[in-house]
């Protein structure tokens, strides 16, 4: 249901993770395309360290346990890379992979095979809308494969996206079943190697409640209030530790467990970098560059100079 303007939103802040969502975040990162993409937590750590001048010793204690879980799942998941790439690679300009759309369908219609023809069509169209990132009800007119093909052509989809949508239209049940098996395997490995994160999840839930309150627009800017759901569930997120993600199709917000810590670290070293620059203004360019290089390579990197 959609929240009416001015009415309060029912927001539930959970203190536990969603293992299936964690594995989708994990595998999406592995297959995220692009030359600048970070495909594992270690690469994310290097990116954060380089971009914000955060010393490695600040990030390693936070991220190493998560990196070990990620590596354990990726190393032991007995599914071909081709099939993983099919489900977990974002395509075209879509922000998310096919896995999210199918996962929502799995939760909503666990017995897809027993649905009536009209119910199956509605589920397929909802899944495709989510996958294509098009407005709600954009596919309500689609009742046959010809309608779908016409829509895809008008929508300017890539050939890869057209093929996936057509395949889903014909064999949705097979893809739901295959993804369900993959997620069961992945979550089993994930939970098997997961350390105790009880306190971390509680802290994240408390911080999320403080930041969001009863209005997600406090942390998600430029939201269309008219399209907000009446109820939202907020989950702590380990594999999406450094960000916030709102799954509109499922009314879930995934709140990164280190969002607060990383924000504080970025601020801390941003302030120290500004202080360092001001102290070096009177030094010649050559000497200044040599000092900066020494600090960057040394143990005092990130510390203030008195």
Regions found by a protein language model. Give the residues of each.
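N-terminal, charged low-complexity regulatory/assembly segments
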Residues: 2-227
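Functionally constrained cores in energy, signaling, and assembly domains
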Residues: 30, 279, 302
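C-terminal regulatory or interaction extensions
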Residues: 194-278
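Short, leucine-enriched amphipathic alpha-helices that occur as contiguous helical runs
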Residues: 276, 285-288
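Short capping segments at the starts of secondary-structure elements
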Residues: 298-304
């Amino acid at each position: 249901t959609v929240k009416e303007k001015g009415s309060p939103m029912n927001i539930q802040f959970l203190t536990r993770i969603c293992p299936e969502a964690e594995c989708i975040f994990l595998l999406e990162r592995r297959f995220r395309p692009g030359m600048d993409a970070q495909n594992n937590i270690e690469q994310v750590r290097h990116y954060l360290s380089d971009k914000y001048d955060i010393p490695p010793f600040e990030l390693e204690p936070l991220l190493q346990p998560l990196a070990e879980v990620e590596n354990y799942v990726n190393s032991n998941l007995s599914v071909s890379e081709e099939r993983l790439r099919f489900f977990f690679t974002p395509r075209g300009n879509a922000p998310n992979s096919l896995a999210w759309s199918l996962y929502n369908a799995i939760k909503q219609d666990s017995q897809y095979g027993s649905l009536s023809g009209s119910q199956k069509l509605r589920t397929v169209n909802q899944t495709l809308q989510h996958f294509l990132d098009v407005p709600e009800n954009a596919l309500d007119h689609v009742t046959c494969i010809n309608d779908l093909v016409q829509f895809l052509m008008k929508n300017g989809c890539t050939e890869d996206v057209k093929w996936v949508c057509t395949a889903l239209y014909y064999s949705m049940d097979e893809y739901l079943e295959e993804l369900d098996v993959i997620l069961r395997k992945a979550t089993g490995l994930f939970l098997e190697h997961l350390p105790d994160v009880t306190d971390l999840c509680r802290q994240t839930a408390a911080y999320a409640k403080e930041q969001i309150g009863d209005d997600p627009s406090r942390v998600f800017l430029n939201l269309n209030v008219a399209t907000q759901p009446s109820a939202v569930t907020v989950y702590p997120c380990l594999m999406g530790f450094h960000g916030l993600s709102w799954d509109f199709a499922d009314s879930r917000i995934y709140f990164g467990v280190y969002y607060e810590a990383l924000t504080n670290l970025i601020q801390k070293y941003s302030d120290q970098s500004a202080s360092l620059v001001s102290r070096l203004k009177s030094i010649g360019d050559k000497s200044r560059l040599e000092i900066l290089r020494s600090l960057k390579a040394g143990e005092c990197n990130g510390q203030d100079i008195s």
